[in-house]
Design a protein with these regions (language model features):
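Short, well-structured alpha-helical interface segments that form or flank functional binding sites
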Residues: 87, 91, 113, 144
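Active-site metal-binding core of divalent-cation-utilizing nuclease and nuclease-like domains
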Residues: 98-124
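Catalytic cores of nucleic-acid endonucleases
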Residues: 126, 131-189
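Nuclease-adjacent, charged terminal/linker segments that flank catalytic cores
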Residues: 1-79
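Acidic-basic catalytic patches of nuclease active cores, encompassing PD-(D/E)XK
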Residues: 64, 68-107, 210
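N-terminal positioning helix adjacent to the helix-turn-helix/winged-helix DNA-binding module
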Residues: 3-7, 88, 114
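Non-catalytic C-terminal interaction segments of nucleic acid-processing enzymes
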Residues: 1-16, 166, 174-210
Length: 210
């Protein structure tokens, strides 16, 4: 899926539910023939589906389109403007759900107040995910994010009887899986395979237990 200004504008037309060509034109200000072409390209790349004269999108489809445009070399700073943090969290949760995890989104803990973006639980282990959704992060910024996520994980375990939990950071833009203090830093496009291998690699990943 090649990057272009029209494809960038088309991201704004990826709205959960059904959308007609006319709706898409009104939102994106792209002409009719280009709008149809863009929507068909989305569907061809597994983003949304077409039934009769309408195109149907899921909550996570906008982020899927963003990832495809980034892979084709599109500029992160321009593309990320079209992305909402809920799109990012939605895809993370969808991937976990597709792999039979129980999901909690935006879990609020009190005393002290902390929020965990996405929790996935399976086979007695919880993955606690902090989503860093758009910009490139320096190593010092990521280190700080890791420390905060470890603290959230400790709080979660302290409030959950018998819990085993692993803190994880998921980023939009990163070349490969990395580790800081044994906490995985996972690019979203590798998150699915990371989850597949998670239990086999658990001995290499930081976990917190009661």
């Amino acid at each position: 899926m090649k990057f272009s200004q029209n494809m960038l504008s088309g991201l704004h037309g990826i709205i959960p539910g059904g959308i007609s060509i006319r709706d898409f034109i009104a939102i994106t200000k792209i002409n009719a023939s280009d709008s149809r072409e863009i929507l068909d390209v989305f569907v061809k790349n597994g983003i949304g589906s077409k039934h009769e004269d309408k195109y149907y999108f899921e909550e996570s489809d906008k982020l899927k389109a963003v990832i495809e445009l980034l892979k084709s070399g599109g500029p992160l700073d321009e593309i990320s403007v079209a992305l909402h943090w809920k799109d990012f969290e939605g895809l993370v949760a969808e991937i976990l759900h597709s792999k039979n995890f129980a999901i909690i989104k935006n879990l609020i803990m009190t005393k002290p107040r902390m929020e965990i973006d996405v929790v996935g639980i399976r086979l007695g282990v919880a993955i606690l995910i902090d989503c860093k959704h758009w910009r490139r992060y320096s190593s010092s910024t990521l280190s700080s994010a890791v420390k905060k996520q470890i603290e959230r994980t400790k709080q979660y375990v302290a409030k959950t009887n018998g819990a085993i939990a692993a803190p994880v950071i998921v980023t939009l833009y990163q070349d490969k899986i990395d580790f800081i203090d044994r906490v995985p830093i996972v690019p979203i496009f590798q998150f699915s395979s990371f989850v597949d291998d998670f239990y086999g690699n658990l001995d290499q990943i930081r976990t917190v237990t009661t």
